[in-house]
Amino acid sequence: RYFDIRMAEGITTSGQLSIRWMANKLNNMLNKTLKTQDKDFVIAIDTDSIYLSLEELVEKVAGDKDTVGKIKYMDRICEEVLQPFIDQGYQELAEYMNAYSQKMIMKREVLADKAIWTAKKRYVINVHNSEGVQFAKPKVKVMGLEMVKSSTPAVIRDKLHDSLQVILHGSEKDLHKY
């Protein structure tokens, strides 16, 4: 008696609108900045996340730097360019939707140099910086894969974790040897 399907659909639809709105705005901004046309820089979207590829931008501007330098460049771009752009974009959405006030907030979570998606909510990310904290050594973030499921035997989980290190940091030959 407290559940109304119309309210649930309204909440779901407004969430989808807001995340797609920002994905489109980010794609348009990066296409304009990099002088590309209809290139999709958004790798994936989730209910509350946008996974964005800055590879082309980083290679164009900071391609001569090492990985640490590239991560620092991405961190600066996220803080100085993307965050204000996202805030402004959500303000535009609030005005477009005639909202009472703008309540959408999106912050950068991780910066990575490598990632693998197998399906929705199933991925591996080689994280160098998480919410502004720079790691001395990258940490592997795993979501939804067998290596983080409790139903997978511990021995298998450990071997899968080890294989990830080879996949992310080794060569194809190293993986075949493993």
Language-model segments: which ranges?
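Common nucleic-acid-contacting/processivity interface regions adjacent to the catalytic cores
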Residues: 1-25, 44, 53-55, 108-121, ...
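Active-site palm subdomain of RNA-directed nucleic acid polymerases
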Residues: 19-47
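Conserved structured core elements
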Residues: 5, 9-20, 41-44, 68-71, ...
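C-terminal polymerase-core module
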Residues: 51-178
